[in-house]
């Protein structure tokens, strides 16, 4: 039964390490996501400007 306990502890530690790494990756992807959102906002502003000029009408 002791090998099972060690194996389960190993899996628990491995899962905790994986979770820590994925949280760091999510933070990095959120930052890049924010910059992507900013780019999309800029593009939508450009589209609104062309609508005001009457180019799309």
UniProtKB/Swiss-Prot annotation:
**Top-level taxon of origin:** Eukaryota
In residue numbers, the region (Disordered) covers 20-57
Q: Which keywords does UniProt give here?
A: Secreted, Signal
Annotated GO CC locations: extracellular region
Enumerate the transmembrane spans: none
Cellular localisation? Secreted
Which tissues does it occur in? Expressed by the venom gland.
Q: Where is the composition biased (Acidic residues)?
A: 20-29, 45-57
Which region is the signal sequence? 1-22
The similarity annotation says:
Belongs to the non-disulfide-bridged peptide (NDBP) superfamily.
The identity of this protein, by name, is Peptide BmKa1
Q: Which organism is it from?
A: Olivierus martensii (Manchurian scorpion)
